[in-house]
Amino acid sequence: LDTSAACHMPDVLEMPYTPPLRGAKALKRFALTADTESSSAHCCRLSSYTCLAGDIIGDYEFDHEINIGDRLVFEDMAIYSMVKNNTFNGIPLPDIAVMKPDGNCKVIRHFGYEDFKSRL
């Protein structure tokens, strides 16, 4: 994923909270284990690409296989995403986007290196 619970979704770690994910069912927090048997072969734990071992968003069940390049839409996540974000481990700040009623997204603010540098 190109997101991080630690950097972009702090409430996921602090509450803890498993955000709704469009097209998937959120499972009980940390329900998946190596021995988990499920009625679906499409269960997975979604996490970040930081080095933080606990940077886990949640366990989810999909009705189809997810693949690299698929768009995953976490819902109900604007709570603290803009005011408590950070750039831990070099993770970029999240873009600000608006989703139109037809499902198309438009990025209205992208943060780059200068934004990172100005926060130091």
State the predicted function of each range.
Residues 1-120:
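Charged (often Lys/Glu-rich) extended helix/loop segments that serve as interaction or gating elements
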